[in-house]
Amino acid sequence: MAKVPDLFEDLKNCYSENEDYSSEIDHLSLTQKSFYDASYDPLPEDCMDTFMSLSTSETSKTSKLNFKESVVLVAANGKTLKKRRLSLNQFITNDDLEAIANDPEEGIIRPRSVHYNFQSNTKYNFMRIVNHQCTLNDALNQSVIRDTSGQYLATAALNNLDDAVKFDMGAYTSEEDSQLPVTLRISKTRLFVSAQNEDEPVLLKEMPDTPKTIKDETNLLFFWERHGSKNYFKSVAHPKLFIATKQGKLVHMARGQPSITDFQILDNQF
């Protein structure tokens, strides 16, 4: 009868061969303790209360670390407070090192120096127009209008809503978001509302047509949130900011009060 191969013995031999290979390459003892169990010699006084980078072979003298190095926070008495492996093969900033000290959880650090847009590859696909030629009124019953320059939006108390800006709301969908992203286009034009930074007026951006897919132009997208008769438009590009109004100001982006962030949607809906 043929002998059944001993898989555990094969794995053991495989690990043994890998250990020998690793020893030749790294010149490290295979019996040494892991990074988390490692102990370190006392540090000189000028290294106390500072961030240091320790690799398996030498101490790094720069704050630019790669994934092969480890970060250690040392207290004034020389006691090691925190140790962590970095998993991203790229440079990180001093702010990232500061986060290690302030973060009570042990885990992977995502460098804050990486811009939001580079951390997400979300694509938003156009579905359909959900509101056609609608008017937006704020809590002061002021309607959204074009300002005199035509480049921005403002608000005014109107007797005739025909003078208010009419919007077409285009709904989008993505695999990652449970909310409803929409665009706000001025009806019968190619002008789309585009979010800006906090307290800056929204812009009217001209596009060739309604985008079928939005990936990089997320300033054009807003999460439409409805609470009863109140409607909120939260920026996809700046998730803490909402389309807002304020007496004497252009329509702008704000977190909340003293600006008004809720609107009523009037006119045709389908």
Swiss-Prot record:
Propeptide positions: the record gives 1-112
Q: How does it assemble?
A: Monomer. Interacts with TMED10; the interaction mediates the translocation from the cytoplasm into the ERGIC (endoplasmic reticulum-Golgi intermediate compartment) and thereby secretion. Interacts with IL1R1. Interacts with S100A13; this interaction is the first step in the export of IL1A, followed by direct translocation of this complex across the plasma membrane.
Function statement: Cytokine constitutively present intracellularly in nearly all resting non-hematopoietic cells that plays an important role in inflammation and bridges the innate and adaptive immune systems. After binding to its receptor IL1R1 together with its accessory protein IL1RAP, forms the high affinity interleukin-1 receptor complex. Signaling involves the recruitment of adapter molecules such as MYD88, IRAK1 or IRAK4. In turn, mediates the activation of NF-kappa-B and the three MAPK pathways p38, p42/p44 and JNK pathways.
> Which organism was this protein described from?
Equus caballus (Horse)
In its record, the post-translational modification comment is: Acetylated within its nuclear localization sequence, which impacts subcellular localization.
Chain positions covered by the region annotation Nuclear localization signal (NLS): 82-86
User: Which terms does the UniProt entry file under GO BP?
Assistant: cellular response to heat; cellular response to lipopolysaccharide; cytokine-mediated signaling pathway; fever generation; immune response; inflammatory response; positive regulation of canonical NF-kappaB signal transduction; positive regulation of cell division
Q: Which GO CC annotations does the UniProt entry carry?
A: cytosol; extracellular space; nucleus
* UniProt keywords, alphabetically: Acetylation, Cytokine, Cytoplasm, Glycoprotein, Inflammatory response, Mitogen, Nucleus, Phosphoprotein, Pyrogen, Secreted
UniProt family annotation: Belongs to the IL-1 family.
Its protein name is Interleukin-1 alpha
Q: Which gene encodes it?
A: IL1A
Its localization reads: Nucleus; Cytoplasm; Secreted
Pfam families, sorted: IL1, IL1_propep
Locate the Phosphoserine modifications and list their residues: 87
Sites bearing N6-acetyllysine, chain numbering: 82
Q: What taxonomic lineage is listed for the species of origin?
A: Eukaryota, Metazoa, Chordata, Craniata, Vertebrata
Domain comment, as recorded: The similarity among the IL-1 precursors suggests that the amino ends of these proteins serve some as yet undefined function.
Q: Give this protein's Gene Ontology molecular function annotations.
A: copper ion binding; cytokine activity; interleukin-1 receptor binding
- Record carries keyword Nucleus: yes
Is-annotated flag, keyword tRNA processing?
Answer: no
Glycan attachment residues as annotated in the record:
141
